[in-house]
Regions:
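N-terminal strand-loop element at the rim of the active site
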Residues: 5-68
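Short His-centered aromatic/hydrophobic patch
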Residues: 90-96
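Active-site proximal beta-strand in glycosyltransferases
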Residues: 3-5, 104-107
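Glycine-rich phosphate-binding loop signature in dinucleotide/nucleotide-binding domains
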Residues: 79-86
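Structural motif
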Residues: 3, 86-87
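Short beta-strand scaffold positions
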Residues: 6, 89-90
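Alpha-helical elements of Rossmann-like donor-binding domains used by nucleotide-donor carbohydrate transfer enzymes
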Residues: 21, 71-78, 98
Length: 107
């Protein structure tokens, strides 16, 4: 089965607002869908992403120089190396930069 990973800095204010139709489209085509983003819900248990098979809570920060982004890079790189995604769909400036760096040697 083919696998797609959507990467953005946050879930509630980005993934949920813009990418649900694309997650559904990939699932309808038989793909396994995954999302990597920080859970920005006030109550973390409210984070339920429709049409997402696997969710990775990555500690992205919106400011690129924050130390948490180093941890986010390491976590995302481990996920990409382990899961072998066919497509990595990058969004938001910091999330996209970290995803591209994490996937650089994988491609």
């Amino acid at each position: 089965m083919k696998k797609v990973l959507f990467v953005a800095t946050v879930v509630k204010t980005h993934i949920m607002e813009f990418h649900i139709p694309y997650l559904k489209m990939f699932q309808d085509m038989g793909w396994e869908t995954a999302v990597a983003a920080r859970n920005d819900y006030e109550d973390p248990t409210d984070c339920k992403i429709p049409f997402c098979d696997t969710y990775y809570d990555i500690p992205f920060e919106r400011l690129p120089w924050k130390a948490a982004n180093i941890k986010a890079y390491r976590e995302l790189k481990a996920i990409i190396d382990r899961e072998h995604f066919d497509i990595i769909h990058c969004h938001t400036p910091v999330g996209a930069m970290i995803a591209r760096l994490a996937a650089f040697f994988f491609m």
